[in-house]
Amino acid sequence: MKPAVLFVGHGSRDPEGTAEFLHIVELFRAHDPGRVVECGFLEFARPVIGEGVARCIERGARTVAVLPGMLMAAGHAKNDIPSEIHEARRRYPDVQFHYGRHLHLHPNIIELCRQRIEETERAAGPADRKDALLLVVGRGSSDPDANADVAKLARLLWEGMGFGWGAACYIGVTTPLLPEALERCHRMGYRRVVVFPFFLFTGVLEKRIRRQTEEFGRRHPGSEFLCAGYLNVHPLLFDAFAERAEEAVHGSPNMNCELCKYRVRLPGFEGAVGQPQVGHHHHVRGIGQDEGGHHHHDHGHGHQRAGGAAGHE
C-alpha cells in the first residue's frame, strides 16, 4: 500500500485554529482517498502524535511519512517532532518512518503572503505603496535561524511589492515585539502601515496581533494601520503541503542546515551545538482547548539527527 502521511500540527487552545488545520488534512484525504492520511498535535489538541501514528499502523501502513505542518524550523520541527519519531520507531520497529520538511519560504507561501496583503489593501482603498510600510509579524523563537527567515520574508515582500519601507517583528519570545515595532513604524511617519501576521492558521497569537494593531490604530488616528489576513486554507497552501508530502513519502526532503544553531556555532548560541534531542511537550499533550491565553513553550532545544530520513528538519 502507499506510504501513510501523518500531518503534525502545533495545536491550539483556540478551536478555530485547530479546525483550520484539520480542514487541510481532510482536503488531503479527499484528494488521495487511496492513501492513509492522519494527523497528530504537539499540544493542546487531540489526537496527539503517538495516537496519529497508531491510527496509521492500525490502518495497515508499513511506511509513515511525518510532515510538520509548520512554517519555520525551530524547536518543534528540530526536536519535539523528531523525538516523537524516535519513540514511534522504538514502539514499531518493523515500520519505516520518513520525516519531511517544514513549509519554509516556499514560492507558494510567498505568493499567498502577497495575495493576503493585496486583499487588505483593496478593502482599505487605494494608496501609493511608496507611502506605506509593511510590517511582517512572526511567532518568534529562541532559534535565530527561524527568526531570520521572518526577516528575510519581510525583505522579499518589501522589495517585491514596492513598499516604501519594510520591517519584521514578533509576537513573543524575541525582539522587537509588535507593540515596540508599531511605535517605531508610527515615528517613521508613513501614511499607511500594513501589518501582516505570518501564521498558517488563526489562534490566540494571530488574534492578539489583530487586536494590538487595531488598538494602536485607534490611539493614532493620524495614520492608517491595517492588519492583513493570515495564510489560512488556500489552493496555494494545499499545493505547497502536497509538494512537501511527496518529498517526505519518497524520503528525500532537501534540508538546509547551514545556520542551524544545533549544528553550527552561532554567536550567543554556542552552548546549543550537539545538545541531545529531547521533546518538551509531554506535559501539555492533548490537554484540551479553551478560549484562554495560549501558554506557549518555546525553550532552547537540543538537536541531533533523528536518523535516516527522519533526521534534521
Which residues does each predicted region cover?
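Active-site-proximal alpha-helix that buttresses catalytic centers in soluble enzyme cores
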Residues: 1-313
